[in-house]
């Protein structure tokens, strides 16, 4: 059982919105090498994360762990706040 849990993905991104009750949307940035031009380019993807305690705020940098699908769009759970964002 522990071997199976070792393969779960952990993603890290910035909270950009609160998508309802117990849900947040994070923006994950990754850098890839362009196949033709060999330049490093940024790629962005939004993930909907399940936040049970509603502890993450907009602007926080958080990590999330992969889990079984919770809903149509949610397949990650909130893990921890890495850096607290600035409140305006």
From Swiss-Prot:
GO terms for cellular component: cytosolic small ribosomal subunit. Belongs to the universal ribosomal protein uS17 family. One of its GO terms (molecular function) is structural constituent of ribosome. This is Small ribosomal subunit protein uS17. One of the primary rRNA binding proteins, it binds specifically to the 5'-end of 16S ribosomal RNA. GO terms for biological process: translation. It comes from Helicobacter hepaticus (strain ATCC 51449 / 3B1). The lineage of its organism: Bacteria, Pseudomonadati, Campylobacterota, Epsilonproteobacteria, Campylobacterales. HAMAP family: Ribosomal_uS17_B.
